[in-house]
Every structure is written in structure tokens, then in C-alpha cells.
Design a protein with these regions (language model features):
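Catalytic cores of the polymerase beta-like nucleotidyltransferase superfamily
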Residues: 1-359
Length: 359
């Protein structure tokens, strides 16, 4: 049952945050009964009334708080932060769709690091929401994989920050695009895991975090209801970010060999999708460099290598439709056109012939 408010004061008191509780009359005069102007001036996110009550009324407000912090570049009010855990038990009643929508919106906001930091450090990310499958309610963990990065030490020779702060910087340095932001958020998700973290001669190492992280990223995104195509692309970025750095730093490395390997992996359906993936990987890797405390000038080589791989991907066919061949090839194949084109594609991929009609 919807009960309508009789007065403006009664109406605004039902709202979530003071910045959303202001009104304007027909004379375009702002009416502020909840201190919204004050909080905008001081860049503070505060609930209207008792924060524990506001969050109990609708647990989605917990996620909205994180998003508004990221959207407005505000700091959370102390009372708001203290009240959040008191409503965590209500998160289990939220639908996955509503939670995922808030996460996506948060990831696209300008001060994304601030919102993510509250989401994770408050332990809200470790809560579970729900989804109905085949008539049954299924519990869905939200983002419990992230908290172990908080305070995770990293080797000082390569990293200026701990695992979580590094991740926040990397996310912040990517464009507001979901593929890039998720790739950045999860690129080091496996660091510090028991099977990954080692201390060798007094130095931290996380060899293999890219491969395990790719598996974790895919499983996490599928669990949250993203489609396989999106999850696969983010997973591919996570899996290849360390190899990409290696190639940038080693000019003698054979990038064509790597390209052929990726083409044969079956990950991509056409050259254009592969080109897009290389550019996305380069952007995440450039942000990764910045997240290590390096200046922007250091990313020039990273982005240039990404352009190189993107251009190279257009030269190598991913599918037979990407082949540039003379019509006489079809005539020569006779009744075995499919097999003939597949063989020709493999020859081009292996560098035996060029992808031109003359060859």
C-alpha cells in the first residue's frame, strides 16, 4: 500500500540522503529542510534522519550510498558508516538484478575509487543477495573476493601501494567503460591467495595470479549474472595483463607468435573483436603502470604496443571470412572449399603466406 505524504516536510523525511531531500518551488527557490546545502558545501554524504533506520527501510540504500559517494566525490558521514553493518542482514532480501545495477553504475562514476573503498572496507561487498532460479531462491555472494586485497603487502621494488589501494588507482585510471573498469578491478584479484603468494629471499611474489585471477574473474561475473561474452572478455584481460607487460619490456619477444596463439585459442570470432580486445588490454595495462606509482609518460610504450597488436590483428585472419583471396582460390578448391579456406587461413596465421590476393 502506498501512503502519500501530506506535507513537503513529511515527503523529504522519507528520502535517503540529504542531497536528495531538497525541493524547488514554482518560483525556482530551493527549499532545504534537511541540511542538503550544508552537506553539498562540505562534500559529505549524510542520511536524512537516523541512518540505521534509513538503511533498514531499504537495504539497496547501502549500495546507493557507495554510488553517490563515487558520483559526487563526497566523503561518508561517520554515523552513516557506523550504521551500514547494522543493515547487512537485509541485503539477503535484495535481488541480484538491483544490486548488479548499482554496482555497474558505481563503476562508471568519476570518483569510483571512493565508492569502491566504502563498498569493500565496510564489508558490504562480502554480503549476499538473491536470485530466483527454477522457482527456487538462490543465495549469491556479491564481491567477497576483494577484501583480502586490503592491506596486502606488495614488493616495494615494483609497487608503491598495497594490493587494494593499487587496485583502486588502476580502476580510477581507466575510462568509464564496464569492460575496462571490471578488468581493472579484477586484474590482481588472485594476488595474496594461498596458492599464489610466496616469499622468496624476503621478497613477495605472486606468480600465476594472472591465470588464477582470470578463472576467478570469469566465475565471479557469471555468478553476478553477466553474459558469457562479457565475462570471457574481462577474464581474457586479466589473464593476459602480465604477458602484455612482458612484451612491452622485451623488444625481442615474438609478438606475432603470441598473436597466432590467441587467434587459435578460439576466443575471438573475428578480427575486429580481437582488435578491440588488444586496445582494451593496453588501456588496463597502462592504468596498471600508473597504479604502481609511475608517471603518465611511462605508459606511452604500453599504449603504443597495444596499437601495434591491434593493427597486427587485422593482418591475421581469425575466421575464413577475414581472408583476402582471389576468386581463383575457390575454383582451385573445387568441392572442398571449406577445407581449402581453413588450410589457407592456417597458412596465413602461421606466417607461411601473406593475407593478400596476390599470395
Amino acid at each position: 500500500e502506498i501512503i502519500y505524504a501530506d506535507t513537503l516536510e513529511e515527503d523529504v523525511k522519507r528520502r535517503d540522503f540529504t542531497v536528495n531531500g531538497m525541493a524547488m518551488n514554482r518560483y525556482k527557490e530551493v527549499i532545504d529542510l534537511v541540511g542538503g546545502r550544508r552537506d553539498i558545501k562540505h562534500k559529505v554524504l549524510r542520511t536524512i534522519g537516523n541512518p540505521a533506520e534509513r538503511f533498514q527501510e531499504d537495504a539497496l540504500r547501502l549500495f546507493r550510498a557507495c554510488r553517490f559517494i563515487a558520483k559526487l566525490d563526497f566523503l561518508p558521514d561517520k554515523a552513516l558508516l557506523e550504521a551500514m553493518p547494522k543493515a547487512f542482514h537485509r541485503v539477503s532480501g535484495l535481488s541480484l538484478e538491483r544490486v548488479r545495477n548499482e554496482l555497474d553504475r558505481l563503476l562508471l562514476e568519476p570518483a569510483v575509487a571512493k565508492g569502491l573503498d566504502v563498498l569493500v572496507q565496510s564489508r558490504l561487498a562480502e554480503c549476499s543477495c538473491r536470485v530466483v532460479e527454477n522457482g527456487e531462491i538462490k543465495e549469491v555472494p556479491i564481491l567477497p573476493e576483494l577484501y583480502h586485497l586490503v592491506g596486502l603487502p606488495q614488493e616495494k621494488a615494483f609497487h608503491e601501494f598495497d594490493g587494494w589501494y593499487h587496485t583502486l588507482v588502476v580502476v580510477s585510471e581507466t575510462e568509464p567503460d564496464l569492460t575496462l573498469r571490471w578488468g581493472a578491478l579484477l586484474h590482481d584479484v588472485a594476488k595474496g591467495m594461498p596458492t599464489i603468494r610466496q616469499v622468496i629471499n624476503g621478497r613477495y611474489t605472486d606468480r600465476g595470479h594472472d591465470n588464477l585471477g582470470a578463472e576467478m574473474a570469469y566465475d565471479l561475473l557469471i555468478r553476478l549474472g553477466y553474459n558469457k561474452k562479457f565475462a570471457s572478455r574481462v577474464s581474457w584481460i586479466v589473464k593476459n595483463h602480465m604477458r602484455f607487460h612482458f612484451f612491452v619490456q622485451n623488444e625481442e619477444a615474438d609478438e606475432k607468435k603470441w598473436m597466432r596463439k590467441e587467434i587459435r585459442s578460439g576466443e575471438f570470432r573475428d578480427s575486429q573483436s580481437m582488435r578491440e580486445a588488444w586496445l582494451q588490454l593496453a588501456k588496463v595495462c597502462a592504468a596498471d603502470v600508473l597504479g604502481c606509482g609511475k608517471p603518465y609518460s611511462v605508459t606511452d610504450g604500453t599504449l603504443a604496443f597495444g596499437e601495434c597488436m591491434a593493427d597486427l590483428s587485422l593482418e591475421m585472419p581469425v575466421h575464413t571470412k577475414d581472408l583476402n583471396y582471389d576468386k581463383r582460390v575457390i575454383e582451385a578448391c573445387g568441392d572442398n572449399v571449406a577445407k581449402g579456406l581453413k588450410y589457407l587461413m592456417q597458412q596465413v596465421q602461421n606466417g607461411v603466406v601473406n593475407n593478400t590476393p596476390d599470395d
